[in-house]
From Swiss-Prot:
Organism: Psychromonas ingrahamii (strain DSM 17664 / CCUG 51855 / 37)
GO molecular function per UniProt: (3R)-hydroxyacyl-[acyl-carrier-protein] dehydratase activity
Catalytic function, reaction form: a (3R)-hydroxyacyl-[ACP] = a (2E)-enoyl-[ACP] + H2O
Key word Ligase present: no
Enzyme active site: H54
Gene3D superfamilies to which the protein is assigned, alphabetical: Hotdog Thioesterase
Keyword field: Cytoplasm, Lipid A biosynthesis, Lipid biosynthesis, Lipid metabolism, Lyase
Enzyme nomenclature, EC number: 4.2.1.59
Main subcellular localisation: cytoplasm
Any Gene Ontology biological process: lipid A biosynthetic process
Descriptive protein name: 3-hydroxyacyl-[acyl-carrier-protein] dehydratase FabZ
Length: 150
C-alpha cells in the first residue's frame, strides 16, 4: 500500500478547468481520490479585484466567490475522474442547497476546499462541500453540477 498523494499544480488545474484570471479560483489540489474526494486550496490575496468594493475599509472575501471555488473544485474532481468534457459538452453549476457561511474569509487566509463526490446520475453530480480556514468551517454547501451537450 502506498501513501502517495494525487496532487495537481496550477498548470494541471488549468488543463482541466476552462476558467482563467480573474475567475480561476482553485490554486492547488493537495490530494484527490478519483470518484471519491478532493482537497484543494485557494489563497486569498488582497490583490484580488473584488476587494476594491467588498468592503474598502473591512475587506471580506465574498461568499459567492467561496461557493465558486467549491464549484470549481467539484469540476476538477469530476474531470480527474471521468475526463474533460468533449468539445460539444459543458460542465456547469446546477444547484446549491444547505448553504451556510460560518465565518468571514479575509486577505491572507488560505481557503481549504474539501469536496466529497456523493453520486452521479444521468450526468448530474452531487457533492458535499466544505471550505475551511485554519480548521474552522467558513462555508458549507451541497452542490450539484451538470454535464450536458451544447
Amino acid at each position: 500500500m502506498t501513501n502517495e498523494l494525487n496532487s495537481l499544480d496550477i498548470k494541471e488545474i488549468m488543463d482541466l478547468l476552462p476558467h482563467r484570471y480573474p475567475f480561476l479560483l482553485v490554486d492547488r489540489v493537495l490530494d484527490y481520490v478519483p470518484g471519491k474526494r478532493l482537497h484543494g486550496i485557494k489563497n486569498i490575496s488582497f490583490n484580488e479585484p473584488q476587494f476594491t468594493g467588498h468592503f474598502p475599509d473591512t475587506p471580506i472575501y465574498p461568499g459567492v466567490m467561496i461557493l465558486e471555488s467549491l464549484a470549481q473544485a467539484t469540476g476538477v474532481l469530476a474531470f480527474a475522474t471521468y475526463g474533460k468534457p468533449a468539445v460539444n459538452e459543458l460542465y456547469f453549476l446546477a444547484s446549491m442547497d444547505k448553504v451556510r457561511f460560518r465565518r468571514p474569509v479575509i486577505p491572507g487566509d488560505v481557503l481549504d476546499l474539501e469536496v466529497i463526490y456523493l453520486k452521479d446520475r444521468r450526468g448530474m453530480g452531487k457533492f458535499e462541500c466544505v471550505a475551511k480556514v485554519d480548521g474552522q468551517v467558513a462555508c458549507e454547501a451541497m452542490i450539484m453540477c451538470a454535464r450536458r451537450e451544447i
